[in-house]
Structures are given as structure tokens and as C-alpha cells.
Amino acid sequence: MPKLYDNKVDVAKKPGWLKIRLHRTAQFAEVDRIVREHALHTICSSGMCPNKAECWSRRTATFMILGDVCTRSCRFCATRTGRPLPPDDAEPGQLARSVKLMGLRHVVVTSVTRDDLPDGGARHWAAAVEAIRRENHDATIELLIPDFDARPELLDTVAAAKPDIIGH
């Protein structure tokens, strides 16, 4: 049990093996520049991922489409909740160009949940896959999709774009 001294808790320090040094490498800076220049979002930033520096330094990122404001408020997620802006029609093309600039062979895409859209964003998902495929023929595309309110026809819309991997 921690000792209390003047209303302060005596907290043990983290063990050395649990500490990591965050280095801002040239690769990290390049990923950051590409994401910013193309007005993209990543779950790495929006979700406050503790592995962001490590991943971005290896030129990997999980792109987040359909904005950075979610219509749900899941306890496990750090993404902002509220009333999102309409989908950006330029986003699929910007995403595809970013993938090309980063030289990615495997692309991971997720999104906020968009219960405010009649199709939950399914057509936007399909457009993103198609744009990535047009500009990055050899890249594999992995999608981490929302539940689309359990509407199978919306999953069919996304699957028709032929991503390589679909997960939820």
C-alpha cells in the first residue's frame, strides 16, 4: 500500500525496460509532412497512439478517412466525438497520392464511424480503395471498417471495391 505524505501518494518509478526514447527521425518527419500536406488524418494522431513515433519512423501509418470526428463515443477510443463535417470528395485521391509518395506496399485504412451518413460512408470507403488501387497497383489494401449499423448491403459496397483484407 502506498504511503501518504502530505496528501501525496508515493508512486514507484517505471522500470527501465518499460521506458522508450522517442526519436523524431527523418522518416517520421517525412510521414508527418505528407499527412499534413494532403490534409489527411491518421488514427495514430487522433487516437493518441503511443507507438506513433516507432511506426512513423518506419514510414508506416494507419490512415483514417471520413474526417476526425466520430458520431459515437466508445469508451476505449480517444477519437473526438461530435457532429462531423461532410465527407471530403478529394480525400480518396489525396490518400492515394500519399500512399504513392510514402512508397507503401501495404496500406492500412480505418475511419471514424459516420452514423450521420445514409450509407455510413460505404461509398467513400469504396472510392478510397479504388483511388489507392489506381495509383498503387501493387500495394495491398487492408481495411479496418466500422460496423455499418449491421447493414450487409453496405459491407457489399465496400467489398465490391476489392480490398485485399477487411477487418472490423
Task: Enumerate the language-model features and the residues they cover.
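Flexible, acidic/Gly-rich N-terminal and inter-domain linker regions that tether
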Residues: 1-72
